[in-house]
Amino acid sequence: MEPTAAGNLLEIMDLARTLRQEQLFIQQEQTAFGQLTGALETNAGTITKLAFVCAQQRQILNELLVARNDHDPLLSCRRASAYDSAQFMDAKQVLPYEHALAYEDLFNYLYNTPYLLALSLATADRLSLLSSGQLGQIINTIATGLYGNAINTKDVELLLKLLRELIEIQLLGSEQPRRLLRTNSSSFARLYQRLVESLFSARIFLTAALHAPLMGVLSEHDVWLDLDPHKLMQSFSQKERERRFGQAGEGEHGEEYQRNVARFHAETLGKLHTHAQVFVKSLQQSWALFPSSLRWLLQTLSQQLRQTHRHKEQEIRQLLTDLVFTHFISPAIVSADLVGIIDVNVSERMRHNLNQIVQLLQRLALNDEGSELVQLMELLMVGETGEDVVAILPQQTDFERSQLAINQRELSQFVEFFRLLTSRDEYDVSAEERQRLQRILGRIPKQQQQQQSQSELPDATANSPEKQQNNNNKKNNNRSLMRLGKAKKKLANSMSFSNSNSNSNKNLQPAVEQLPPLANGQANSSNISSASNGDLEQCSSHSGSNTSLSSCGAAPAAPTPAPTAVTNDHQYCARDEPVLMFSIYNASAKSKLKPLTEEEVLKMNCIGQDGSNLLPAVACTTGVVAPSSNNDDVSSLEAMRRPQDDASIGNSDNLEAISEAAHSVASSLDLEEQQERDVHENEDNLSDMVSANVSGRGTPNISGRDTPSSQVTDGDGGGGDMAHHHGHHVRAANPQMQKMLLSKARSDIDDKFCKFELKKFEVDENVSIISDTWSTDVLASDSENTLDATGSERGGDRGDRGDRDRDRNFSTPLIPSAVVLPGDNNFVVEALARAGAGVISGPHMDASDQRSESNWSTDVLASDSEKLAEIDTDDNASITAKSDIGPGSGGGAGVPEAGGGGGVVGDDDDEDEQTPGSSGDGEPDPDPDPDRERLRNGSERSQEDSAFFDAVNSYEDAHHLYHGASSLARSSVRTSYHVMGGESSFQQQYKSSGAEGIGRKTTPLMGTSCMRRQTSAESSISNQSLNLEEPPPPPRALAKHHHHHQHRDRDRDRDRDRDHREHHHKSAALKKKKHQEHKEHQHRDLIDFSDCSEDKDEEEQPPGLVQQLLDMFNQEEQQQQQQQQGCSSQSSVEHRRISMEQRSQCIDGRRNGILAGSMRRHQSLNYENHEIMLNSMLPKTDDDKQELLLCAQTQQQLQLEERAAAAENSCSNRAGAGAGAGARGTSKPPSKATGAIPKSISFDASADKEQQPYRDRERERDRERDRERDRDRERDRDRDRDRDRDREHHSAGIFNKLKQGFFKHRRGGSSSSKNNAIAIAAPSSINPNPSPSSATDPGGRSVSFDPSAGVCVSFGTHYCDSSEDILAKYRRKVSSSSEATNSDSTGNGAGGGAAAAAAAAAAHLHKHVNGGLLPGVAFGSVKQKLRTVLSKTDLHSGDFRQTTPMRPLDATTPLQIYLQIQLAQCISLQRLPQISHVAEALRCLEQLERPQHGQLLVELQHDLQRRQSYLQYLMRHRQQLLLRSEQLEQLEVRLRSEARSCQRCLMQSLVRLYLAWARQQDKLEQFQTEFGQLRASDERVELVEEFVEQLLQQLITSADLLDDWQVDAAREAIERMLLELMYQQVMFPNEDADVSRDTVLSAHIGKLQRFVHPAHPALCIAQEYLGEAPWTFAQQQLCHMAAYKTPREKLQCIINCISSIMSLLRMSCGRVPAADDLLPVLIYVVIMANPPYLLSTVEYISCFLGRKLDGENEFYWTLFGSVVKFIKTMDYLD
């Protein structure tokens, strides 16, 4: 019962407020997404630049300090600062565009081919083509530029693969591989060093393992360590010896001296071993943090060395120890300050001590068999050997690199390096790789050419053949080079590599010129191997221009000799020299940041909750739609570049597989075991029979040709061609069908074969009958499609196989494998899509084709039934279906072939499939599975031909593959193979079903063409497993199909078919078992479809143009046919058109989503295949809308004609049951299979034909009364569905089933399900008058509510209202004219009784559709408009109430009242856009009945609840964006810190070398003399500060320091060097007195440690703070003070100590602690730490910094000083 009017109005106000809140939140979040996404993209580019700068500065530091190549420190600092302020520019803005593309192609090619890079480097090493410095530059370019300094997971992976290839090429072939590991001795050693320097995980491990031991060593400032103490004795000065050991002499003095020396030796060795043990223990504790990438590399090296059997185990162990200790851990210990492990400046004495410790550790690791380090090395070898690189890398998603940075000098060197290699015969690469490299390099100008073009002296090398050749082919390039600026001149003048063999190598040019251009992109498979995410060939998206530009005759010439020398000049990077940014083709970077749309999230939500079975279908659509949208040219480039792609299905072998697949089954199998489910399986079997038999298998076609159009064109043109490039998306959803069909085809094969006498093809009576009867007026040229040509365009070895293809493709050239029937959207979608893709090279199917096809379908007479009784089941499963549903054609047949991740989910029958890494060039496996071969091409067709594919596929796939998992689990797992590569798991879950919208945005036709090419028979066959009500049929039918045809084909391919049969026999039992298991779980899983059907379908629906065009064509056809045919043929035509109309209604109903959840659940299963996927017909672009407008206009004209035809050809009405059967497509299956077609074939049309004119007038007069009657009929029809089905089950023959096969896909409801018996909302809207035609008879196509749903609650969101509105307008005009027009609004052009029945059905539909909407009003559109209005307006006053009206039926509903209030408010506020919106909503509401207003509100509330998942997604997505943004910010901070650390180290080195000059040494000696003469501390401080400033000014002048931070860094470095030099004097000005005082205080504190504890009453630490005791980190900070030498660094340790205590106290109490809280804790920490030289440290800091402190630092320092004073006065006796 409805609530009161006032209550309703309040509810509407509340609903509007809620919708407004939701809308505001969504808008705010989307705005924030845009801002965050932009910031993330900017940060990602910044990180790429920072990584380049860090790497370059690190290299400069290594050259200066580690390599010790006598580099000028001043020049090194200038280079570092130049990189810090470098200008990064897009290479396309600096270089000529074609040159920039060529560079990008080179980088992207090499980026994805580690083997080629490894071979190049190994060749350069072996031939010594380059000097050590030059090769180092090349390695630097690869590590820094190509692999981005290894900060990204993908880059680390590729760098590891490169090292693995170098292991195989360099180390395994060497007799002494250990030598090659020495620094700079091989490319492997260089790259390994760059890897360990760049890996952040390596730095984490080193910091964890080495920081504490290092600080311990550095804290002992007065300690000398050496393995040979005698060397230390010699290094001491005479004064130092006397101080340490006393006077050397005779007697007692001599003995004491010797004792002191011996004690010193023992202490030195003891301390050395103690420190070494500390390092060993720390390594043991941190060994679990050893980087997994390095561990994988070591395991790979160990395994491969052992496999050679040329090296002893000891040698292998030593080599691995060298890699870990000598080249990884030891350099980090010695140069800890340079690596960044510690921030302490390491003096020469400390570095000497660390060197001694490192030598001892290496001895232990190499020579001591029982040492702990040897055990640690053995631990590294434990684990998974042979593991893939990806498995050991962290799967991070925070940073995706899309750019590559390289300066022009390195760019020139890199190109010249490969020019030099490709000109050498010793460069042992394949001809294809060499050819591709030469073509790319040929597009890049040489340095000589650049110099000449820039200097405008083209005649300098006019006689050079290289120059002539490039002048002929690259005139434009040279002209553009003439315009190059200063940057180009630097590039031209930069270093080039010498080539001593260039003259002899010029002979290579003719051979290179004779090489054919890269046919169809013969890219090396390694180029593809690393692009599993589908983005790879975008990695070479310009590679198409490689083939086009470089194959035009611009053959690369051998480089000419040029004098080369690595000088210091080229090392200098000028400040104005830009760093070039090239693109790395990585689309996943952007796809990760793109949020899902509302509809995508809602679809995913449905899948996750109730419709897991739909997920794979959506995932498939994602792959199909997106790639095919705007990749017409890209896909062609990819096709040219992917010769070995396993998705290359356009080759002749695969075409042969299609042909054999379609005809490998005998044509006269009985139908015994299919009768139970032929209601569904034979929905389109007539179309299959037509396509299979019209051309006559084995006989010449009507046109005299055997054309493979129905085999190849449908699947390969639209699906195959796109599957060729995006195969893993296209075929991803096929496994489900494979399993279903395999399971059916495996049983009782021998028994079936024994039933038949195999005959020759030429005498097949079925061929003759059907051909003679149906195809006399058909010419092959009418609709012969050209996938043959398409395949030949793409194929590699197509030539000699074309004849075989034609021999094997026997289907009619007129009919596509999915026969295009009225309302079937398949073929024209396909043709248009492929025409748009540039694939069609033959005529499309036009109206004449469809007219001819209608002739076939209507010319069949009852007398043919006896002969047709033996129609084979291949005819019942169409040709394309045969290729799709072959027993061996499991999910993997369609999926893994595509080259994507989909292949992983193939079923058990997929062992011999091609995997992404295998060759897909058309060479089949030795024993290919025939049905899998069929699927490789047929699967694409099937996906496009029928929407069934997606739903069944999603269910079957998920069910078979993830059988025991939940729906969500299955859907999630399935999704991961179809989402765009590199997405986070979170986004994959949402993106799985929604990503199809990506492609949908760009092309309405191509997207669905790949998806929809599925035959009707396949749809119906698979659909039987979707039928909830029917028992699981025996999985036997397809075995009959395939094997009988295999016998018929035995004359052609006897051996191949025998192999196919053998394969079928092997897997028959397994498939049967799997199918039965699937059936057992069917009821449980299929329920999960419930609420996602209409959401799910939106993308899978083909463009609206196709169906409407077919309607028009078939109206004309059927009018002509029915003038010549009898009533039965008229019924059949009408029947076909009825089901087409029903399908249209379902489309509209699904589009508007007015389906109850429970009904929708059944409908998604039983509305047949098209129904499951229909909503992809939603027009998403303006083109779609224009197409629909055109169709609607044409419809009006056709409807007028149809009315005339209906008046002329009216036939007598049929009985109720027969009418019901005909109206529903006679979907009841016969209970017994006789194998023959009954003489009496029921082509009953819908009932109530005689009442149709009356209903027209009745509806115009009193719409409400008829609507109520229709609702009653609806209810009764739903109750009687099973009974009707059983009756028809016994009365229908094969033609009855064939008739069902034509139409069941095209109507809204399935007769085999009680799906429509349940209505959720407004029971009054259910029709009390049962009419069989009310559910599925043709109604006005203008009505967009599924007829069988009654008044239901929509759980979907609906889109494209504008196109719906346009169609609705035309529909109103049509339906308001007359009943005949109404009946014909869906294209029913049948004459006589057929037209009358269709009109009656239209009348019913118009009355009960949308729960009783007026004709032409789209319920979903009204709801969408109402949502828009309510979410954009808000009441400024709620002071309104409604009184109860006198006449309730005439009253204005609360919804109208609210909108009237809104309209008045908008007029008052002059909000023009809102006025128009509200007025339109009011207009739409006026056309609805009062109960429907309540229904609208109920659905809006349900939609609001459903959209909660979208709001949650928005919050989660924002959280992810925020997290990713923070990660990028932290990465940026880390990189900036690394850059600053490098520059500080450079400045420190510069200052050290600067002070080492002789002139500065004199100044230092003079300063020390003056300092020693002063006694007052103030005077000493002033002298030090003056001297520091003097040195700083000189350094600024000489080193050209401009930046403030450089000046500050230089000042700190000078202070540190100077105070380290005079540390004893400044720290202990009173020498021994200060030392003794510190010793006394240290002993006092040591006694206090014995009894002081945190809870000691003298400390008075609050109880709440005791939980964090003993504050270990704070104690460590105080202990580390001794390692630092400057007062500022020591003060920073104290501040760090106090800050850590404060943070812990704040964490304990939740508030900022007071000084009284801090002081007792600090006392305890100082006592327990007992830092050395405490008093001297306090005096040192106070002397130099006491007056300069302020703020927090001053407070902390004052606090610390008071603590020290308090401790001095503490009495430990208390």
Swiss-Prot record:
Chief location of this protein within or outside the cell: membrane
Pfam families registered for this protein in UniProt: RasGAP, VPS9
Gene Ontology MF terms: GTPase activating protein binding; GTPase activator activity; guanyl-nucleotide exchange factor activity; small GTPase binding
GO biological processes: endocytosis; regulation of protein transport
PANTHER family on file: GTPASE-ACTIVATING PROTEIN AND VPS9 DOMAIN-CONTAINING PROTEIN 1, RAB GDP/GTP EXCHANGE FACTOR
Protein family: Belongs to the GAPVD1 family.
Protein name: Receptor-mediated endocytosis protein 6 homolog
Organism of provenance: Drosophila pseudoobscura pseudoobscura
Lineage: Eukaryota, Metazoa, Ecdysozoa, Arthropoda, Hexapoda
